[in-house]
């Protein structure tokens, strides 16, 4: 299951948050972006439980991550 996570970060924490997300096993790619969100992460999860663990357990535990929106690819 492939998903894209749109991430809002606290001021001055985008680059460090991106570096930490790059180390997450299921993360395929993460990019800092401009606009409404600060980063976009592509995830390859085995199922919805795995996706939930990556987003809620790993990404949300990173200092500076303020909010996420998850989009599941079909």
Regions found by a protein language model. Give the residues of each.
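A compositional/biophysical signature of low hydrophobicity enriched in polar/charged and small residues
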Residues: 1-74
């Amino acid at each position: 299951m492939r998903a894209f996570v749109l991430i809002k970060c606290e001021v001055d924490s985008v680059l460090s948050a991106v570096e930490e997300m790059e180390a997450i096993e299921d993360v395929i790619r993460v990019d800092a972006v401009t606009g409404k969100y600060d980063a976009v992460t592509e995830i390859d999860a085995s199922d919805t439980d795995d996706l939930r663990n990556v987003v809620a357990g790993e990404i949300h535990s990173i200092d500076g991550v303020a909010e996420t929106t998850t989009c599941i690819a079909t």
